[in-house]
């Protein structure tokens, strides 16, 4: 294969074996190094390609470049709340910052920045308000209309302004189950049949709604009762993704060890109850188990529940679970993580980590 070089140099000589004719592109004004051109060796070859020492100007938008600059050094996501920085300026979202401090406390080590290994603590690190404001101005897509808005305005747009946001009929109180985009609401309400139903028909619907309301009140009353217990503990937990060692690996999640009620615990989670190919299912669920790692002198009966953490917006319906932990029986069964639907589950799976808050209530005999 012939090689044509307009000017000898190490850049051109290193292109041997690429299966293409090589030349160099003229740079206007003679400034800077010449750029290497790869031309197809015959008419049936692939389209023309150019190797650039850097991307074409304007090929990557500014906001896309800023994502990698302003992301958290730990989870690599854009922070959703406060942004902290180490003494060398490396950025951490509030959730990861708290977890670094908690992990160091459990290991009896000094917490360090994952980038530069300088010491970090609540007194050594400070918030970076400039970065927080910059992130709030970065564009983000509305999940309903797919238009872009600054992050600071997105929540208001989704709740109050978006014409495609999911809304409910005003006759929901008398049993209308309709849900749809906001721009169809007026047409539906003008045609809704519920206002014309008889009293007897409405009574049946209202009875069903009363039963649902009664179950919700039982849950909240149970939570209020648990809050009166003597021994209550809570902590922020971070589920991190791992893969099994099987021939066909499976995704699972596990938290670092944490301490609640003077005991050491671990949480594990799995997708679709570890079914063989969860990627082929349109329905996504997460289930979790609580594991007691420390030894206990007597059976330890506990109630526990997971809620959304302070730095995330995942939608979870609280469910109270109960278990008696002993040295021989220290793992609960896998129980459902009460996410409202598969869409919310996919949001969690798409994130680098899953941040939640765990409450444990010890039942005294």
From Swiss-Prot:
Question: Is Metal-binding there in the keyword field?
Answer: yes
Q: Give the top-rank taxon of the lineage listed in the UniProt record for this protein.
A: Eukaryota
Segments carrying the region annotation (Disordered) are 1-56
Please name one Pfam family that this protein belongs to. Answer: Sina_RING
Q: Name one GO molecular function term.
A: zinc ion binding
Its predominant location is cytoplasm
- Zinc finger (RING-type) boundaries: 72-117
Question: Where exactly are the zinc fingers annotated as TRAF-type?
Answer: 113-186
Q: Keywords assigned by UniProt?
A: Cytoplasm, Metal-binding, Zinc, Zinc-finger
- Gene3D superfamilies referenced in this protein's UniProt entry, alphabetically: Zinc/RING finger domain, C3HC4 (zinc finger)
Q: Which CDD domains match?
A: CYHR1_C, RING-HC_CYHR1
Q: Where in the cell is it found?
A: Cytoplasm
List the GO cellular component terms.
cytoplasm; nuclear envelope; nucleus
Q: Which family does it belong to?
A: Belongs to the ZFTRAF1 family.
- Record text on subunit structure and interactions: Interacts with LGALS3.
Q: What is this protein called?
A: Zinc finger TRAF-type-containing protein 1-B
**Name of the gene this protein is made from:** zftraf1-b
């Amino acid at each position: 294969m012939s090689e044509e070089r307009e000017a000898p140099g190490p850049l051109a000589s290193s292109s041997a074996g690429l299966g293409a004719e090589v030349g160099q592109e003229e740079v206007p004004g003679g400034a800077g190094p010449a750029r290497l051109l790869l031309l197809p060796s015959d008419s049936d070859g692939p389209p023309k390609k150019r190797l650039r020492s850097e991307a074409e100007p304007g090929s990557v938008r500014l906001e896309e470049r800023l994502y990698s600059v302003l992301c958290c050094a730990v989870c690599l996501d854009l922070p959703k709340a406060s942004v902290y920085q180490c003494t060398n300026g490396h950025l951490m979202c509030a959730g990861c910052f708290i977890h670094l401090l908690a992990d160091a406390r459990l290991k009896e080590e000094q917490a360090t920045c994952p980038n530069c290994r300088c010491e970090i603590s609540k007194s050594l690190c400070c918030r970076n308000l400039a970065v927080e404001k910059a992130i709030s101005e970065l564009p983000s897509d509305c999940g309903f209309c797919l238009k872009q808005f600054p992050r600071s305005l997105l929540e208001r747009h989704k709740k109050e302004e978006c014409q495609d946001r999911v809304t409910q009929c005003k006759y929901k109180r008398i049993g209308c189950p309709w849900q749809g985009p906001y721009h169809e609401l007026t047409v539906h309400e003008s045609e809704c049949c519920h206002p014309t139903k008889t009293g007897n028909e409405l009574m049946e619907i209202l009875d069903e709604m009363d039963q649902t309301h009664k179950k919700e009140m039982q849950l909240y009353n149970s939570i209020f009762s648990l809050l009166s217990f003597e021994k209550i503990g809570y902590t922020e937990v971070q589920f991190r993704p791992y893969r099994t060692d099987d021939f066909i690996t499976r995704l699972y999640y596990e938290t670092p060890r944490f301490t609640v009620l003077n005991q050491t615990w671990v949480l594990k989670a799995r997708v679709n109850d570890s079914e063989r190919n969860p990627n082929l299912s349109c329905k996504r669920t997460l289930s979790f188990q609580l594991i007691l790692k420390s030894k206990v002198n007597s059976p330890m009966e506990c109630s526990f529940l997971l809620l959304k953490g302070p730095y995330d917006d995942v939608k979870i319906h609280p469910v109270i679970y109960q278990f008696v932990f002993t040295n021989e029986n220290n793992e609960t069964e896998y129980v459902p993580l009460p996410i409202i639907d598969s869409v919310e589950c996919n949001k969690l799976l798409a994130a680098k980590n899953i941040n939640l808050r765990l409450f444990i209530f010890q039942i005294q005999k």
